[in-house]
């Protein structure tokens, strides 16, 4: 089987249809980083059945579809097609009829992948097994993607065993063994569940047998209860009728008494109405008299209030006049005060203006004295400044020399300290350097941590694989569960529909006999045609039309010879036994022949529904009757219930499988999380070991550099100390050469005293000038205040005159009002006398009206008493009548309740209860209490039976049938498990034989290839960790030229890469794969090793039929290829493929040279 072409369309960056030809020899793929070279490898693996989107560098499987670019829209599908040359007919038998196999995988966005081989849709598993049998596949070591060399180097020995399995060609056996193990596990699970169900069914059979016996006893007790209930209800109905008659007689007597009381009450009401009509006019007259009297009393009270208000007004006027006199006196005094104040302010104004003129003359002389004092002080201060400058210069020089001396002394002291510190630091570094850690031990610790890291990475890969497998198992468990639940739902819906139809047809008082018939399948039309509407009749004795049990009689004629009775195919109540025994089942042809042999009452019927009767009546088959349809539906309902039970069992099993898969996925996820946490810990340990090694190395380098710097500092400090000593001696000599500054300080002190005297004089003169200025300012402010105060007093004087005029006007008004009020008492006395006279007359009228009203109300009260008494008698009569009517209605309701209970409980009319109780007319009946006691006893007997399953016999037959079916299924499962276990053992045996046979061959090729690639040295493969080759790990022991033997992880990067390549090529020589892809495996190699690598590739291409595809950036590797494909990205986000046939170019060049 040879791969010849790979066609991509819409896969990742290859948006346009692209053909990648895979020809014999070496094919190179080159191009810049990020242009899509690795997409070719991923397309090849994807078409071989890769299921992990992570290994394809995608966020999900839809991410392999072209997602669009700046100028290209996204695609909705992607497709990769591989063409395989099958001319040697090495494909599986089902596909071995074609010379060329086109294997395609197409994915629609959000719709999943579809696999096809030569246009026929197949499973992903079929494609994976096809490539696994050919020693290749999506996870084959022959497809060496970026980082694959590193994975082989870092892999655990158990993981490297996969290389041997590919060499032995047992990958397909592993897949088949895994599938068989899954089937074995499922079969064992099903066997356990079947055995559990069989045990449950056995328990149910025992229980149903007991329930069937209870059902028979229950029916007997129920019949007695029904008869006793009928007698009890009959007695209650008879008593209720008698109670209704007695209540009716009492009610008629009450009605007559009510009529008499109604007449008496009507007469009393008439008299009451006549007397009540005279009261309104008397009440109105009394009210008018009382209103007139009240109006006069109110007038008298109003007159008193007006007189009091007049007196209060006179007192108020007197008080206000007195107040106005005080206000006028106060305003007059305020005008006098204003005149005096204005005169005082004029005098003060004149005096202040004279003082201001005197101060102006005095101020001019003081200003001249201030100018003279300032000039004298300025001359003295200038001389003081000159002397101060001279003394400061002298002092500054002295201070400078003294500071220089102090500075040099401090420098000497600091240098001495630094010299001591440098010497101490040199001694300390010598001690620390002698105690520094051994870098070799730290390097070994780094290697140990790296080995642990490699083990943890292997554990993480195993956990990821386990999680992927668990997720695949979970995904595979969902679809069967959905199908099973849909099947259960469909069967439940059909069963409910049929049950509803059957129940809707039997909603009558007596269930028809058809409900008790069970017909063998295929005989529904026959029994429906021959019995027809007779099947709708019940067997209940109380029904007006019913079947009765007369039994098969000995004198009944036998059916014609060779005719089979319908009773043999029908299970029916005994009431139908005689009828069914006289009905024969024949074919249509025989029916026509035998119809003349029928005796009285006999019938023949065909399975299609043709009927022949003894009296010559013949009915041809027609559409199924209602009874036939009903029987068919009941048969179908039974089949559905059986199917539904099995479907529920299957759904439960699949649900448990899904739950188990979910639990396995959770465990796998937890294991992956734990392994990743361990990996992170191992990485932290590696980083810590590397950091410790780097820190120790940095510390050693720092000590060496520090020692060199301290030696330089020691030499520099010695030179600086000598310079500091010389500078100190020079500064001390300069201080000795300076003259003393005593004379300059004395002259400066004399000038300072003269300046202080002149400053005091100038200050006194300035203080005198400032006092004069302040006095002038105060005088100006006082003149302004006098002007404002004069204006205020003038306003007050004008206001007082105005207020006096206003008050005098108000006094005149109040005096006039007081004069008017002086005559008010005489006027009020006259008015009061007139009102009192009118009040006396009004009181006499009111008393007369009140007396007349009281007499009328007394008579009315007596009339009301008589009317109330008659009304009470009428009310009592009505209540008595109502009670009688209520008792009569209650008796009728009780009668109706008894009749309704009879209809509900006995399902007969009340008149038929006696017949149901088998009561003979005129017979003496037992007391009601005795019947109730007997009924209670029967009911207790029925209740002691508890919940009774009336369908126990039918359920018993169904469960026994299920038990037999499951027992047969259990035997089949046991046999299948034996076959599966035998098959798994056979596969394991074959895999071990192949693996051991290929190990020696691979090991021999590996030794030879290792020596070739390294130019010497030794290497070998070892099976470790287990005696079973299927569980053992593969370890690599290598000894490059000039080194001791060591494991793969301790080699250098280039050596590891060459060793891994030797292992991969050894596998090729053992079981050559149709294709080998090497994705930048030459990246860690130097030019010399690249030459060796290319020599080996060339040799492999010649000695095997494997077709090599090499993705590289190395120009040496490019030059050794037979052909090159270039991957470019001229348009952003879109890859294009171009090819160059290097061998053809060389041939053309050779021809031109020749």
From Swiss-Prot:
Classify the main location: cytoplasm
Pfam families noted in UniProt = SMC_hinge (PF06470), SMC_N (PF02463)
Alphabetic keyword roster = ATP-binding, Coiled coil, Cytoplasm, DNA-binding, Nucleotide-binding
Q: Which InterPro entries match?
A: P-loop_NTPase (IPR027417), RecF/RecN/SMC_N (IPR003395), SMC (IPR024704), SMC_hinge (IPR010935), SMC_hinge_sf (IPR036277), SMC_prok (IPR011890)
UniProt binding sites for ATP: 32-39
Q: Which SUPFAM superfamilies match?
A: P-loop containing nucleoside triphosphate hydrolases (SSF52540), Smc hinge domain (SSF75553)
Location in the cell reads:
Cytoplasm
Recorded GO molecular functions are: ATP binding; ATP hydrolysis activity; DNA binding
Supply one GO CC term from the record. Answer: cytoplasm
Regions annotated as coiled coil: 170-215, 282-505, 627-993
What family is it from? Belongs to the SMC family.
What NCBIfam families does the database record attribute to this sequence? SMC_prok_B
Q: How does it assemble?
A: Homodimer.
Record's function text: Required for chromosome condensation and partitioning.
Name used for this protein in its record: Chromosome partition protein Smc
Biological source species: Rhodopseudomonas palustris (strain ATCC BAA-98 / CGA009)
Query: What is the phylogenetic placement of the source species in the record?
Result: Bacteria, Pseudomonadati, Pseudomonadota, Alphaproteobacteria, Hyphomicrobiales
